[in-house]
Design a protein with these regions (language model features):
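Conserved beta-strand-loop-beta-strand hairpin that lines the nucleotide-binding pocket
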Residues: 1-36, 78-155
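Conserved short strand/loop->alpha-helix "switch" segment adjacent to the catalytic nucleotide/phosphoryl-transfer site
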Residues: 47-71
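STAS-typified acidic loop motif
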Residues: 36-46
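Short coil/turn residues that cap or connect secondary-structure elements
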Residues: 41, 57-61, 82
Length: 155
């Protein structure tokens, strides 16, 4: 993803920021499966996002791990980003390349972000789950829009 995310327009309706991505690492194969979908920023929509990713990745060994990670990232978009404002949305993308590497992204409308839960907090561990399951992951963007992404290499 390019640094342009910070200056990108805000998501509206079915609009989304087209990712500017090349291969994740030198020598990676081109995409063989790619899909994206826009979801209303409502808690129930996180379940639909999980089903969407599960459908795109059906039959792949790492599908369950990616579905769990997308669930965590989509929940963050719904609960903690500006997407939660009236009419807000988030976008989920899933990509599988010819080498079997999976990439998933959740894009939201950005806004303030505090990713450091207190020691005694009951919530706020989703990114730790993503970090534990993903081969690589990260977050880019800021107040105008944010993309949380993860990659899993084939087992």
């Amino acid at each position: 993803m390019s640094a342009a995310v910070g200056t990108a327009r805000r998501l509206t309706g079915t609009d989304f920021l087209a990712p500017e991505r090349g291969p994740s690492a030198p020598g990676t194969a081109p995409a063989v499966a790619s899909a994206w979908r826009v979801f209303a920023a409502q808690p129930l929509q996180v379940a639909y996002a999980r089903r969407f990713v599960a459908g795109v990745l059906a039959g792949l060994r790492a599908a369950d791990d990616v579905v769990l990670c997308v669930s965590e990232l989509a929940s963050n978009a719904v609960l903690h980003s500006s997407s939660r404002e009236p009419g807000g949305c988030f976008v989920v993308r899933a990509l599988v390349n010819g080498a079997g590497r999976i990439r998933a992204e959740v894009e939201d409308r950005g806004g303030p972000w505090d990713c450091d839960p207190g020691h005694d907090e009951e919530h706020g561990r989703g990114l730790l789950i993503v970090g534990g399951l993903a081969t690589r992951w990260g977050i880019s963007g800021g107040d105008a829009g944010r993309i949380a992404w993860l990659e899993l290499d084939p087992a």
